[in-house]
């Protein structure tokens, strides 16, 4: 009997009978983000530059090491949007590249403040930037350089796939994990969305910039990146950058101050071709014969000492961290 009564009411609740009823759409519930000061603790300065200051920090909940970059609004020249909010383009680029790939720094969070933005990123421990790493060694042997260089190429390829060009590839923007030898590309403050047309602005490091920028203040993203990769590879195997002055960049003459294999020299010279159209593509660099030479390194000659998980961490507690 009860079931039959429910059945008799079905016409009242049917969709057709409800067409004339007003429908009230509730606005989505906005979840407020916890204040930065409650989520993170900030410590000492890791570094500073034209785009802001980077601090060491940690996440309060679990002690996760983080790097916090404070970017002043007045210094931001390139902007983008996330969820309809205007943010520095650097945050947009980090969001694009920072997931699913270990070779670039990962964005964890960001906050807007009245005077600027706080960009929260992962902070790898037991790392050293490649500049300091090379300085300590004097220069890298070709096997170590090859392994590092391939990782940089993979990071660049990943960025391209995400529609991003870094525009400031250099030794100071690469972190070396001292336990594994893994490299991580950092600092997208000079980056841009990748495009096939010319760029007429450049905020990267001048000694890594291509001759077409020095002479014409114009360049294409991919060919300019290849030039900076040539400078970086020279830096790895020779211990210093090839050019210091604008005139040297425009002349493009190379002097190899150390004994370098002909294959490595040829790849560097190719990347540092004065005409952008003469430079290799990223895939041509991957396919170059020097990139495929034997990578067997004797343990006594290895620059990176691999550590197993059960290694006594206390023996390596001091680290030179850089972001």
From Swiss-Prot:
Its main location: cytoplasm. Disulfide bonds: none annotated. The keyword ATP-binding applies. SUPFAM superfamilies: Protein kinase-like (PK-like). InterPro entries: Kinase-like_dom_sf (IPR011009), PIM1/2/3 (IPR017348), PIM_Ser/Thr_kinase (IPR051138), Prot_kinase_dom (IPR000719), Protein_kinase_ATP_BS (IPR017441), Ser/Thr_kinase_AS (IPR008271). It catalyses: L-seryl-[protein] + ATP = O-phospho-L-seryl-[protein] + ADP + H(+); L-threonyl-[protein] + ATP = O-phospho-L-threonyl-[protein] + ADP + H(+). One of its GO terms (cellular component) is cytoplasm. Proto-oncogene with serine/threonine kinase activity that can prevent apoptosis and promote cell survival and protein translation. This is Serine/threonine-protein kinase pim-3.
């Amino acid at each position: 009997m009860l079931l039959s009564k429910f059945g008799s009411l079905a016409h009242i609740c049917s969709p057709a009978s409800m067409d004339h009823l007003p429908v009230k759409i509730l606005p989505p519930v906005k979840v407020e983000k916890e204040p930065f000061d409650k989520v993170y603790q900030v410590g000492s300065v890791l570094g500073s530059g034209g785009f802001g200051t980077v601090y060491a920090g940690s996440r309060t909940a679990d002690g996760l090491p983080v790097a916090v970059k404070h970017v002043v609004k007045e210094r931001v020249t390139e902007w983008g949007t996330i969820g309809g909010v205007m943010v520095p383009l650097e945050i947009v680029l980090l969001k694009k590249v920072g997931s699913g790939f270990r070779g670039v720094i990962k964005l964890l969070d960001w906050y807007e403040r009245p005077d600027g933005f706080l960009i929260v990123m992962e902070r790898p421990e037991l790392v050293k930037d490649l500049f300091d790493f090379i300085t300590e060694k004097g220069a890298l042997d070709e096997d170590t350089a090859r392994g590092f260089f391939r990782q940089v190429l993979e990071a660049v390829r990943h960025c391209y796939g995400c529609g991003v060009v870094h525009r400031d590839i250099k030794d100071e923007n690469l972190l070396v994990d001292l336990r594994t030898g893994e490299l991580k590309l950092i600092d997208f403050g000079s980056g841009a969305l990748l495009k096939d047309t010319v760029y007429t602005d450049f905020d990267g490091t001048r000694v890594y910039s291509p001759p077409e920028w020095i002479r014409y203040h114009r360049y294409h993203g991919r060919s300019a990146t290849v030039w900076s990769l040539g400078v970086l590879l020279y830096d790895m195997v020779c211990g210093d950058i090839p050019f210091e002055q604008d005139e040297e960049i425009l002349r493009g003459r190379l002097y190899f101050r150390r004994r370098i294999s002909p294959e490595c020299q040829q790849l560097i010279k190719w990347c540092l071709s004065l005409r952008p159209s003469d430079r290799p593509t990223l895939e041509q660099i991957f396919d170059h014969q020097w990139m495929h030479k034997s990578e067997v390194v004797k343990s006594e000659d290895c620059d990176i000492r691999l550590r197993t998980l059960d290694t006594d961490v206390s023996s390596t507690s001091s680290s030179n961290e850089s972001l």
